[in-house]
Design a protein with these regions (language model features):
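Short cysteine clusters
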Residues: 81-87, 91, 105, 146-152, ...
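Short, small-residue-biased leader/transition segments that mark boundaries at the very start
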Residues: 1-6
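Juxtamembrane inter-helical linkers in multi-pass membrane proteins
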Residues: 14-44, 108-115, 175, 179
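Juxtamembrane segments of multi-pass membrane proteins
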Residues: 101-103
Length: 211
């Protein structure tokens, strides 16, 4: 409806104001995970000490499975999109025939958000419909087709960020469901064992100089 388009155009102003000004390609980290890693390398840290007030706690869920797990900015993005399609036109995955469409990611997020809101209004705040954004609206194939190139973010005239939603959905799959494409499983194993994506131990990294 025309009124919906006007509402989204009005939302463009606050959405642009609150857009991320950091260099594109710099992903945000999970504070709870970062704090745990820092503690591991701190010889003075007492693992049995009582947590201090204000200390980062373990989140209920890593990443996002449904719209309630997304940030408020991602939800604002969903309500701001006017469906112009510039993001999908610039997406290399979409251009090469992959299932991914950044425009659809945003539209699916908005549709799911409206569905959740309607369910809560009609059935109470604790109502669960046993559906989720990941799986019922956005497939695993879609989010793993993304190359994280930020072309969609760069092209959006109102600073919508579909990539943040994709990254949060991926984080859920990896950290909560342990679902990783086979192409990435080897890389993650190498990082765990060698501290780098390559299949070389840290002591052997400079061997190529002598060859």
């Amino acid at each position: 409806a025309a009124s919906d388009v006007y509402k989204r155009q009005v939302m463009a102003f606050p959405n642009t104001y609150f857009s991320n000004l950091n260099n594109k390609g710099a992903f945000n980290n999970l504070s709870s995970v970062k704090e745990e890693v820092l503690k591991m390398f701190d010889p003075s840290f007492d693992p049995y000490a009582t947590p201090t007030e204000g200390e980062a706690s373990v989140p209920d869920r890593f990443g996002a499975k449904d719209v309630e797990d997304l940030t408020w900015k991602s939800l604002m993005d969903a309500y701001t999109c006017t469906e112009c399609g510039r993001c999908t036109s610039a997406c290399p995955a979409s251009q090469t025939g992959k299932l991914l469409s950044p425009r659809k990611i945003i539209m699916d997020t908005r549709d799911r958000l409206e569905e959740v809101g309607a369910n809560k209004r009609n059935n109470g705040p604790d109502f669960k419909d046993n559906k989720s954004l990941l799986g019922d609206y956005i497939s695993e194939e879609e989010i793993w087709a993304c190359t994280s190139c930020n072309a969609c973010v760069q092209e959006c005239p109102v600073s919508i960020d579909p990539l943040s939603i994709i990254i949060d959905l991926r984080r859920y799959l990896v950290m909560e469901e342990s679902k990783v494409p086979s192409e990435l499983a080897g890389m993650l194993t190498n990082i765990e064992n060698n501290g780098a994506p390559g299949q070389f131990a840290q002591a052997d990294r400079n061997n190529w100089v002598d060859e």
